[in-house]
Amino acid sequence: MARRSQSSSLGDNPLDPNYLRPHYREEYRMAIDALVEDDIEGYYNFLQNANVVDFLSRSEIENIKSTVQTPQSAGNVPELPYGEIDQDESSDTYWPLHSDLDAPGLDLGWPMQQHSFVGPTEVTMLVNPAEPERPSIKEQARRLIKNAHQVIAVVMDIFTDVDIFSDLLEAAARHVPVYILLDEQNAHYFVNMVASCKVNLEMIHMMRVRTVSGVTYFCRTGKSFKGQVMDRFLLTDCRAVISGNYSFMWSFEKIHRCIAHLFLGELVATFDEEFRILFAQSQPLVVENALVPMPQDSYLGNQFGLKRTQSLRNPRGYLRQPELGGYQYGDRLDSILPFRRDDPFRHTIEPSAGPMQVTKYATQQFRMQQSFLDQGRSMLASRQLEMNAFKRHSYAEGTRETYASSRQYMKQRVMNNLEETESHYQREQHYYQSEGMGHDDRGHYDRFNYGLADQHSDSGYPPELEAPGNINVLSSDDLKSDSEKQYNIGGRYDPQGHKRPAAGHAYACQSSPTQPHPPDQKQLFSTGDQVRQSQDPSVKQGLRSWRINSYLSTYEDGGEEGLHQPMGSDAFEDSHQQPDSRLYGSEGPGIHSNIRERPNIPTKPNLDLRPRFGKPIIQDRNQVKDNTSDLGPTSTDTLKPAISASSLASSTDNEKELAEPREISITKHESFRTRINPMLQRSSRLRSSLIFSSSKLEQHNSSQAKSGGELQEEKEESEPIRYSSIVAEILEKRRSLSREPFDWNKHKKADEKDVKHASTGDLTTIQDTKEEPIKEKEKPDNPKPEENKVTQPTVPSASQQITSSLNMNDPASRLQYFKDQQEKRKTSKLELDLGTKSQEAAIKKPETLDTATKVPDVLLTSEQSTVKAQEPTVSQTDPVPHRPVIETKPKPSEVSVDRPYTTNKTLTESIADAPKKEPVKEPTKSLKPFPSPKFLKPFKSSQSSSRRISCGEEILTDATDAEKSELKKSRSFSTSGMSRTESRESLSSLGNSESKDTKALDFLKKQTQRLKGILGPKGDKKHSGVSNSQEDKSMKTVPEVQEEISDKGKPSESISSSTAVENKPSAKPTTSRYQSSTSNIIFSSNLRDDTKVILEQISANSQKTRQQNEESGKGDGGKDDVANSPFQSRNRFSRAPVNPQERDNLLKRIESMRKEKKVYSRFEVLYRSREECCWERGSVEQANQFLIKSIE
């Protein structure tokens, strides 16, 4: 195709006054052909014969002669198979539409083009020598470089000015991308200058040096020669440009006269575009070629060094040395660079020396030069200044600068630096943690980047000093084989190591400017397998074990393994994660337990999380608080607020072992659970199906076994597991709600179907596995779990518990209890008396309570959700049966119905366990733990109920804002206190719910009736209506009935479903602190799906229970209504009475919707009501209220 010069006059009218005669002459072209073919004599002969003036200067003739290239013979080019080529994109056409090579990318970044007007163009002319009062061209260029923040782009024919180069290195050290395009033929000048400065361009990760050639001129015989790039301009931030005939050379500053212009404004866009065009046409700087200027006769001939290595024959093979140097000018590579071997086999002389024998001697030399460089940057210098000179066979080798262009050399380097990739993860982590700029995470040059050897050796410079910018001074130790070197963590944390922008690259050239080119990648990746081997054992094994465990493991280990770092903290969890820390490498199972350097927990923004492959250490609840400050990499500040559910889920064995030391890991995992964990989702999927089926079976059994007294024992056994699982599910839901919309239809269907097919055996297995750990765990828990167990602070709840126990076991006692309640309502004294009586009743009938509680788990959940927290809040601190702690101090009027639906298992367990234990003693304990029981109850209920909102979230509504704050506190405490065994117990309680169903149903019915009577429709609507008197006495202690399952030896599950009823601030329910732990348990159990299942179960059970309650508890309900009516009016959250029939209809409709929608979302738990869609993220109370609204 004719060039513009050939067609310059095409179409022009000779008569046009602006007509320009064509300057193209065929004689010129023929003369060039004669010069190329017949040398200079043929050229002159042709000029004479054609009567053409000599149009070439002597320098041009010499340049053409030196750069002529002959076409490759067909024999030298391998035959390439050509397939069918699309006609539209044919590559064999004369002018192919698409190149077969990708254009290099501006991988370091480039400012976004501003489409807005940047301002009028301003042009300032600069001359050299400069006028006295005007800055020189060099000064202006250096000022622009210094002030650049986004990008620096240089296009230069010859670049040998060390001062400007030093400024560019400093800019690269500031993480300002620096792109340098050099003329291909003059690139060797630049390489020599860099070598003399002892800089390894490979180590400068923020600098890309490439070469560009001029236009290629093709002769008719196939020979060709290239021109040169004579552009000279400096572009900074795409806002300012200096352009002219000023080259970055000393002579241009001192002796040459030149002119340059400073452009600002719109005109800069043209330079921006031009640079990007040139960069796309550029080739990587091949130091091998550049270092040895070719003889004039064959500038690109074989002498060019292609003979030395195979990689050079394919220039792309060595594409660019990883942009020489990460050292800033001041920290140039070691003096190794100064001498270079031209021996073609120099790279093979010492394969092991491949890593470049850069030594501290070089550093010392450079130090001497530092005054000259005047970088002011600290250099990593080792006292071992002597280098093994004999090992440095070449300047290129010694520097690791990829001057060695052979791929073999590259492989050697990679092989010698396998350990670099091992440290890759930590380096990367460090990179993010540290503010400093790590030179390079590229495994190959980590040593240099991080100055590991220097750090560990006696370094002349303190390690805290950052390597100047990106410049790293290498020592011979740095270059030793990996086996010889041992990395210290400090090496990775070396300030030098933080400058690397591409933290993810494991390979030396990965971030190199020429990286994009396939040959470079091939070089790196061919050895990459070896490099990766170090990672494989830990990471791959961990991933593999995680997958297996996620699917196959029971709750013991499934929750922990392979979980990503916590993505976020729960709304109620005040976890303070250190944003700095990131976990990249797989952690050994024990790594997180005691390491306290920095919590390596990635902050929420960090999404590139790697799963932890170790089980978290579970601390004693007492220790958790203390240890939260000492969190290791596995624990975050969130330890206090919540114990990671995963840790709860993890095997109790770990808990035992880890309990002795302060275990930090627990809390960290809590934060895990707070966010939806895909891994958890996987494991929970399998479990959820089991839970569904188990819950169904439980419901069915509960309906059938209303009078099954013999089932009580079984229920008691299974209660801890079942309760814990239910609570965990509820809590799981609550957390998931904060992040996930809940689909009632899906849940209902999944619940019904899955519950029907639930494998009770699996749950029982989980129970068995967890019961023992729970028992053991209870012991380590120390007084706190005991308090939780004991703390069932709700005098009203106690009365209710008694009532429930009475309802479950003795109608006469229930009747008496109702009478007592009425008396209490009449007078505050009576209320107190009733509270005492209820405690006594609980003591008298612990077994009945246990049975009742156990059975009602699911039923109770539904019923109580209907009743809306009429039942006393029961926080199942421990799966071990606890005597219901009834607050004698709190007034019975404040009886807050436990949100059994929320803590179904906890309520039932606490009720069932309460009779076994001395209720009076427990109340005192329960009173101690929490100043504001309401919050605690709502907190637990929020944990459990938020996830299981379908049953009814009574608790949430009751809590006031102050209560909410307390909820968070209590939750954090409980979470931190919570142990994995507890979570397992909750799971096991789910499995055992069946045995509890028979009496639980009776109890639930009776209690629900009683609660309905007490709270009336208002109370029902108000799940939050903990106790009507509670509202009056909002600050009363929370009536939390927390079962101490200590009898069973299981860790108390501090799931206080009890609504927060603050009868008296004096009462401090400790349970609340552990209540949150149940939520953690749920999380650890990976019960997101399970939680949904439970919600569905609860809703179904609530329907059944309501129906049963309506049948069996009508008489009781009337009494309760009478007794509770005054309190209802007091309830802040009291609502207009809701017709139970309507609720039943609503529940039925929900079930039908669920049935219709068989598939439920594992990730979305959305509470939908007619008016609003409440994302359960903050307040459990709000969730409960919302649930109530939806039910109504």
UniProtKB/Swiss-Prot annotation:
One of its GO terms (cellular component) is cytoskeleton. InterPro entries: FAM83, PLDc_FAM83H_N, SACK1. It holds the Pfam family SACK1. GO terms for molecular function: keratin filament binding; protein kinase binding. CDD domains: PLDc_FAM83H_N. Residues 435-542, 557-661, 695-720, 737-1082, 1094-1145 are annotated as: Disordered. Residues 437-447, 737-759, 768-789, 820-834, 880-892, 914-925, 994-1005, 1107-1122 have a biased composition (Basic and acidic residues). Residues 926-946 have a biased composition (Low complexity). The keyword Cytoplasm applies. GO terms for biological process: intermediate filament cytoskeleton organization; positive regulation of cell migration; protein localization to cytoskeleton; signal transduction. It is found in: Cytoplasm, Cytoskeleton. Residues 523-538, 629-652, 790-810, 861-878, 1068-1082 have a biased composition (Polar residues). Keywords: Cytoplasm, Cytoskeleton. May play a role in keratin cytoskeleton disassembly. Belongs to the FAM83 family. This is Protein FAM83H. The lineage of its organism: Eukaryota, Metazoa, Chordata, Craniata, Vertebrata. The gene is fam83h.
